[in-house]
Amino acid sequence: MAGGRIAHATLKGPSVVKEICIGLTLGLVAGGLWKMHHWNEQRKTRSFYDMLEKGQISVVVEE
């Protein structure tokens, strides 16, 4: 038989450096998205209170 040698995939252990880099990248991306969400909420809140202070809106129901 000529097919005595078969190329098998060799399994390697986990690469610590690669896992640290992937974890760091995912953490930074998730943190950046979280910060952008909070900046957007802060902008909305600041805009609401500015409009409330200027009298453009009111929280009291008019009868």
UniProtKB/Swiss-Prot annotation:
Keywords: Membrane, Mitochondrion, Mitochondrion inner membrane, Transmembrane, Transmembrane helix. GO terms for cellular component: mitochondrial inner membrane. InterPro entries: COX5C. The chain crosses the membrane at residues 16-34. It is found in: Mitochondrion inner membrane. Belongs to the cytochrome c oxidase subunit 5C family. This is Cytochrome c oxidase subunit 5C. It comes from Oryza sativa subsp. japonica. The gene is COX5C.
